[in-house]
Amino acid sequence: LEKNIQELGDYAAKLEIKLVVEALTPYESNFFTRANDLVELFRRVDNPYVVGMCDIVPPFVQHESIMAYFDKLGNKMDHMHIIDGENGSDTHLIPGEGNIPIKEMLYEMKRIGYDKTATLELVTNYINEPRFYAKRAIDNMRELMAEAGIV
């Protein structure tokens, strides 16, 4: 796997694009499931075009700090999947409809000056009517961002 990521990273460098590696839940993967796994990968694959991201459900499910990704990955922390979840489950819920403290996370992201990308991730429960759920997710996210003082 390390060799493959090195090769993909070298190719990404030639194209001047980033290869973004996502830690998944233990239900989805046994390779990269925590921030420390990504730190170890970046130690072994020293390539500025290989970066990491945080889908906030995996750390939440594993009782790992979401903000640890920012602390541990530093400038390699390049993207976020913002979604909500419930304790002990990897089910992805619309932001604001689960137990993840998203408003507080947004406040902390603002406080540390995170200025890279983030997307809302809608999967599983929302596949049949994505337009309905996307609108609700965007509306909820706008409200959470306003409460966190971002907009």
Walk through the language-model features, giving the residues of each.
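Hydrophobic faces of well-ordered beta-strands that scaffold small-molecule active sites
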Residues: 19-21, 50-54, 78-82, 116-121
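Gly/Pro-rich active-site loop or hairpin
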Residues: 28-35, 39, 58-115, 123-132
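Active-site acidic/histidine proton-transfer and metal-coordination neighborhood
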Residues: 1-51, 63, 151
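Structural motif corresponding to the early beta-alpha repeats
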Residues: 2-6, 14, 110, 115, ...
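Alpha-helical scaffolding segments of alpha/beta enzyme cores, especially the outer helices
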Residues: 3-10, 14, 36-40, 44, ...
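C-terminal helical cap(s) of enzyme catalytic domains, especially alpha/beta-barrels
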Residues: 129-151
